[in-house]
Amino acid sequence: MKLLFICTHNRCRSIIAEAVTNAFGGSLLQARSAGSQPSGEVHPLSIKYLQQAGIDTAGLQSQSWDAHEAWQPNVVITVCD
């Protein structure tokens, strides 16, 4: 199943959700994340937290949800306030 996590800036929550899902979802789940107004950078504390948890941060980037339109996720989850 393909999951797309969305938040405004794709800098913290959606990035963490993507990384954790991909780390623990096995072959059943594929996750990506995006933002409606991406900041262009992942928050350094998000990277630090994930690395401390032993979760791979390679390839994580802040990007627009437009970048995932062709990917066609099965579920879109918003993680905004």
Language model segments and positions:
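Conserved active-site segments centered on acidic
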Residues: 1-67
